[in-house]
A protein has these predicted regions:
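Generic hydrophobic alpha-helical scaffold/packing signal
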Residues: 22, 124, 167, 265, ...
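Short, glycine- and charge-enriched coil/turn segments that flank and shape catalytic ligand pockets
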Residues: 49-72, 95-101, 217-232, 285-293, ...
Length: 443
């Protein structure tokens, strides 16, 4: 059992718990196996009636009782719970009557680091002793939840929230999502109910995004994505979801669940909802039928991939949305194939995407700093650094205006700086927003 971990036949995640395991294994001491409880496996020891129990000659130790049972009485104590728990990997599959099973050894054990020796080490020992093999290949140690004072959550301290109350207030999926998001591998978690709001808001975000897409479906839309009609933003988001799938799979393989969830969160919220969906809104208002159709099919494809990635963490929300999105003969999400990204990247103009984001963000920032109300449109003057940049950004003017709530956007490579303007310097352009009636000059 000791060699199995030292030789990496069994891997710990995170690996630093190997040191704790080795410390216990290298310093094993005698273990009192009897407990005075009402439940458990009664100790298989009988004492001859009317004799001195301290004398081993009066003991009968066996897995079967003595033949003259009327002359013996069994020990009242039961075996320590870990004595029976260490048999769990194979005892639940019919052992000792069943010697082989496809479920032994299993791939992974998920447990807490506080029972490394009590349970993990003893299961490894019993696996080799009774089955001649390791019981599992990987051991993932969960984080320990602590309160804001650093104390372990426990009933005795009364500092553990009622999970049912959290479920009713925030939702089951939101609670699970939030706790996993805040639990980095190998680190304890300082639990705060405020953190559960992140999961609730995320579930609401993906629900609203899915609802928006389905409400904008038209019968005239094509059934598939028109590859020839993809623009740079389409290629960017399709490449981004493939990259997300790759990263999430890598994190799952290394049991870095919080990193996987963070990647899902960042892509869905920041890339898909905050940018691509906003672009799609403009297309649904202004685009032609091909643009609208592609926007719908791409958005639907991406949401479904996100739901598949999300399903192990948020099974209820993901299944409900999936049932609204799936095609007539498509399988339920629980038996659908896990998403795999393509090995090749989808070629797109990354600089154009970055410039577009920076310009829109800069205009929004100025609006916020000047406290311009959302209902008021503004004028923007953009000086491109050169004519090449001007040519690249010209086709995006209407989209920039739409996402920045601007009335006019004058783009040129001229360097005349307008007076009395708010300024933002971007990588590709300098932005000027005439203050005019946007601010009170007397203040």
């Amino acid at each position: 059992a000791s060699k199995a971990v030292k030789n990496n036949e069994i891997n710990f995640y995170p690996n630093h718990w190997v040191k704790t395991y080795n410390h216990w294994m290298d310093n094993i001491q005698d273990w009192c196996i009897s407990r005075q409880l009402y439940w458990g496996h009664q100790i298989p020891v009988w004492y001859k009636k009317g004799t001195d129990r301290a004398n081993q000659d009066n003991w009968f130790v066996s897995t079967t009782p003595p033949t003259d049972l009327e002359n013996w009485e069994q020990d009242n104590d039961v075996l320590d719970t870990w004595f029976s728990s260490w048999l769990w990997p194979f005892a639940v599959h019919g052992w000792p009557d069943v010697k082989t099973t496809k479920y032994f050894p299993t791939n992974a054990l998920v447990t807490g680091p506080d029972i490394i020796f009590f349970w993990v080490a003893r299961m490894i020992m019993s696996g080799y002793e009774f089955m001649g093999d390791l019981p599992f290949k990987d051991v993932y140690f969960t984080s320990i939840l602590r309160d804001e004072k650093g104390r372990k959550l426990s009933k005795s301290l009364g500092n553990s929230p009622d999970p049912i109350t959290l479920f009713e207030k925030y939702g089951t999926d939101a609670t699970r999502f939030s706790i996993m998001l805040m639990s980095p591998q190998g680190s304890d978690v300082y639990f705060s109910e405020h953190g559960i709001e992140v999961g609730r808001n995320f579930m609401t975000k993906i629900w609203n995004a899915s609802r928006f897409i389905m409400l904008n479906h038209e019968d005239s839309f094509a059934d598939e994505i028109d590859i020839e009609a993809l623009d740079n933003f389409d290629k960017w988001i399709l490449d981004s979801i493939d990259e997300t799938v790759n990263e999430v799979n890598k994190y799952f393989d290394k049991y870095q669940f919080n990193e996987a969830i963070k990647k899902i969160y960042d892509f869905t919220w920041n890339e898909f909802c905050n940018w691509y969906i906003e672009i799609v809104k403009h297309r649904f208002r202004e685009g032609d039928i091909t643009s609208k159709s592609n926007s719908f099919n791409i958005s639907k494809k991406i949401i479904k991939k996100v739901l598949l990635l999300l399903h192990p963490i948020a099974p209820f929300v993901s299944e409900e949305i999936w049932n609204h999105l799936k095609d007539t003969n498509e399988e339920d999400i629980i038996i659908s194939c896990w998403p795999k990204a393509k090995n090749s990247k989808i070629s797109h103009d990354r600089d154009e995407i970055l410039d577009f984001k920076e310009i829109v963000t800069s205009i929004r920032t100025i609006r916020s700093e000047l406290n311009v109300p959302p209902s008021k449109k503004i004028d923007v003057i953009a000086h491109a650094k050169n004519e090449s940049i001007e040519s690249r950004l010209n086709p995006l003017i209407d989209l920039i205006k739409s996402l920045s709530n601007s009335k006019n956007l004058n783009l040129s490579s001229k360097k005349e700086k307008p007076e009395n303007s708010a300024v933002a310097v971007c990588k590709s352009v300098e932005l000027y927003i005439p203050l005019g009636d946007l601010v009170n000059k007397e203040e």
